Each structure stands twice: as structure tokens, then as C-alpha cells.
Amino acid sequence: MDKNFKAINEPIIDFEPGSEHRKLLLEEIERQSSRQKDIPIIINGKEIRTGNTKPCTKPQDHGHILGHYHEAGPEEIQMAIDSSLEAWKTWSNTSLEERAKIFKKVADLIAGPYRYKINAAAMLDIGKSVFQAEVDASCELIDFLNFNIEFAYTMQNSFTPISPDGMKNELEFRPLEGFVFAIAPFNFFSIGGNLAISPAIVGNTVLWKPAPSAVYSAYYIMELYKEAGLPDGVINFIPGDGPSIGDQVLGHKELAGVHFT
């Protein structure tokens, strides 16, 4: 990918009455509303179902179940940590160009075929209006992805140490040693996604814990990673009980950082 890549803000679609965009979004809302999604834990690219499930409901109608998610327990959390540490060995040595290429594809998928899925999921799961979903779930997440790529290139290419005659000074940017724990909020789709994305773009591996009330919409982002070709184990998806997961993860000796808002 071009190291001179420059990001631009994603244009906002207004979904005006009678438009094709509005028609396709309404069809996707109906599709998601009429079925229940079975949401697994994702560790090292594999779907894990513990059988210990919690419902995903519409915030304005708790009787409308959008799906059920499987909760990660201590065994799954340890598996996710092990997966992250193993994936780090390769991902931390993958070039920025290759990492950027994958996440640019995620941005392009959201801007294209996934836009209606993402917006509908945010509206149903988090209670966003159509305008809020378009701005937050689609445009801002696309912008996070694109600008993170630009900023990563800027960071890598803009600092050249001065080397006097007879000396050589070098500056190396490298990932953290260990794994990053990303804790997503319940009400901000794009920030929730970016908490996992931004460390990964610069070579870190991530345990991503979505908010219990926003697992449904977060899972759509996980599906995007797979389609974009993100290697297994770079981002592990661990929905579950916050205090239990937090106690186990925060006490681990290989924890390199916590990313939350």
C-alpha cells in the first residue's frame, strides 16, 4: 500500500425518502429484525460456543431478541491470551504496508457492501437513529481506519534521526511486547471498533471485549475482519462478564496495555 496514502472523511449518505439507499437499509433492518443471530466467541479465527448464553435485545424493546451470544469463561480467556501471544510472533513482524492493506479493505467493505448491515445493526442493537448510525457506525469507523493508516505511515516516515559524521543513529517503532486488552463502550460503535483496530494496525495483537449490551453490533465488525483477510489471532473476540474477564486479564504477566474509553 502507498506510504503516501492520505485519508479523507467519508461522505455521509442522507437516506432521503424514496432513495435506493433508504430502500436497501430498510430491507436490511427487516432482515435482521426477523431472525436471531447466534454469536460465538472468536479465538484464533475459530468459533467457540460455550452454551452459556445471554440475549441481545433492542434497547427500546427488551422483548425483541436479536440473537444470543456465548460468554467466554476462564478457559476461553486463557485460550484467547495464548492465541494473541502466538499471533504476535508473526503480526509484530508484518510490514506496515501489509497491515495497512488489510485494514484499508475493512474500510472499503464498510463503505460498500457492509454499510447497510453495519447501520442496521447499530440502529437495532444500540438504538441509533438512521443519521446517528450513518455518522457513527459507518462514516466514523471508516475514518478511524483510514486516518489510523495515514497516521501510522506519518509516524513511521517522518522521524529521521540526525547522524553526524562517523555515527549512525536509528529510530525504530515497534509493537508492545505482549497483548492489548480493548474494552468497548456500549454506546459508541465506531470507538468500540477503533479500540481494537488502532493497536492492531501498528502491530499489536488484541483481546477485544465488547460491551454486553452491544455484542450484536460488534460481531458484525468481527465478520469484516475475516472477510478482509486479517490473520487468525490478531483480534480475538471475547464477550462475557466484565469483572470476571477483567480480573483474569489484568492480572496476566503478558498484558502490555489496556485500551478503553
Where are these regions (language model features)?
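C-terminal segments
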Residues: 1-27, 131-134, 139-158, 171, ...
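Glycine-rich loop-to-alpha-helix module at the N-terminal edge of alpha/beta enzyme cores
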Residues: 50-51, 55-57, 62-156
